[in-house]
Regions:
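Single, function-defining residue in the core of a domain
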Residues: 1-39, 43-46, 85, 98, ...
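Short amphipathic alpha-helical segments
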Residues: 35, 49-50, 66-67
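Active-site-proximal, Lys/Arg-enriched surface segment
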Residues: 38, 66-145, 263
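Short, charged amphipathic recognition helices of the HTH superfamily
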Residues: 44-54
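Short acidic/histidine-centered micro-motifs embedded in hydrophobic/aromatic stretches
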Residues: 55, 72, 324-325
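Short, basic interhelical loop/turn and adjoining N-cap
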Residues: 55-68
């Protein structure tokens, strides 16, 4: 057996084991579907059922395989179950001060006309309103490293039964994350998090949950007076400074930013909060509201709070990876259940590639070999997860046996893996 054949066999075995872990509550036909979809999405780097079907190498016409996949994706919604399992697995990797980025996103469908419950969404990348489905996403990351941990991804529609609002979907996701992570992790949210219902969730108990939220326009209480956050930010002196390396149009540039923090409260709550102000990113100051403890006389403590928010930008790269690497916005199924299922399956694929394969020394060696395959074909990419996806694609796509020959995992196969660093 050649070295690449051994890598492929090992990769298939790990994929089969991972599939069994996240589908343990389903019946046998659904377990088979989930394993085939996880394999096919990675082997084709695509979510179109025709391309997934080709990678399965079945001894029947492709249209038969495609029809079977379509039928099985449509008859049961397993979004909540797989999100639960991925969140459970990911929570064990989260440390006390990791950042958990909460993001209401979108799955844009520019040219779709007949997809079920197709609604209107705001396209964040193109800054326009168009057809598509809203997304709820959560990813965890560490400030000191490039490691990202996908936790949650759900596509939904306001036209579907049982969906009340974006707020209800966000709260559903946040509740699940709290259920598995407890008080560990700091929730970081962009401007979309500046809403009363989220402050109620984070500050509704005696001990506040830790968060960093970018403000838009809100009144705060400072020194007993009610003041607008924009006015307060403009008037606040920013004596501390740091130099950041930013990338604009492919070029590395230095940017000096100035920052400070001041204690504040929200008008309806008694909890002590801090308003962090950063000047230099744009014309207007960046305003961050946090419940994390900030030592105002230590610039490192203030900047740490800013770093919690800036780490969210690494999570944005992970979102782009999930969308672009597997062509999620090119999904071509009509039923609402199928769209939701494919969305959560792409989350599972990204977790497998970016987290599961690196959780033990033996698997880390497999990742290194996959990375070498990726470099040989593509060069070194800027984001490690792209390299792993490319490497897996190059190993699985030309394979002629697909999932045939992989033994069915039993419960004894799911041994505990301890990460010793």
């Amino acid at each position: 057996m050649s070295s690449e054949s051994a890598i492929v066999a090992s990769l298939k075995g790990q994929l089969s084991k991972f599939s069994g872990m996240i589908s343990k509550g389903f019946k046998k036909p659904k377990k088979k579907l989930i394993k085939e979809m996880l394999y096919g999405i990675q082997a084709s780097k695509d979510v179109k059922l025709s391309n997934i079907g080709r990678t399965l190498k079945e001894n029947q016409p492709l249209i038969k395989t495609e029809d079977r996949l379509s039928r099985n994706l449509d008859d049961e919604d397993f979004t909540d179950s797989i999100n639960e399992e991925i969140c459970r697995l990911g929570a064990s990797k989260i440390t006390e001060d990791m950042v958990i980025a909460i993001d209401p996103g979108d799955l844009r469908k520019k040219y779709a006309k007949k997809m079920e419950f197709l609604g209107r969404v705001r396209d964040g990348s193109e800054r326009e309103i168009g057809d598509g489905y809203p997304l709820c996403k959560a990813v965890a990351t560490d400030i000191e490293s490039k490691k990202v941990i996908p936790l949650y991804c759900e596509a939904y529609s306001f036209l579907a039964e049982g969906v009340k609002s974006e707020n209800s979907q966000l709260l559903k996701m946040i509740d699940l994350i709290f259920e598995h992570t407890g008080d560990w992790g700091i929730h970081a949210i962009d401007r979309g998090g500046d809403r009363g219902v989220l402050y109620k969730k984070y500050l509704g108990e005696e001990k506040p949950k830790r968060f960093v939220i970018r403000l838009v326009d809100r009144d705060l209480r400072h020194q007993g007076r009610r003041r607008n956050c924009c006015d307060l930010a403009k008037a606040l002196p920013t004596p501390y400074e740091t130099v950041l390396i930013v990338y604009e149009e492919g070029e590395e540039k230095k940017r000096t930013v100035y920052y400070n923090a001041v204690p504040v409260k929200l008008p309806s709550y008694s909890h002590k909060l801090y308003l962090g102000v950063v000047k230099g990113f744009g014309i207007e100051p960046m305003m961050l509201l946090t419940s994390c403890l900030v030592e105002r006389n230590r610039k490192e403590s203030i900047w740490r709070m800013v770093e919690y928010y800036l780490a969210r930008w690494k999570c944005d790269e992970s979102y782009r990876y999930i969308k672009q690497c597997y062509n999620l916005e090119d999904v071509r199924v009509r039923s609402y259940i199928s769209i939701r299922n494919i969305g959560v399956l792409v989350l599972a694929v990204s977790y497998f590639a970016s987290v599961y394969l690196g959780q033990s020394i033996k698997l880390k060696m497999l990742v290194e070999r996959i990375f070498i395959v990726s470099k040989r074909f593509f060069g070194v990419p800027s984001f490690f997860n792209y390299a792993i996806a490319d490497g897996i694609f190059n190993l699985l796509y030309p394979d002629k046996t697909a999932l045939r020959g992989i033994k069915q995992n039993s419960i004894e196969d799911f041994q505990l893996c301890f990460d010793f660093g």
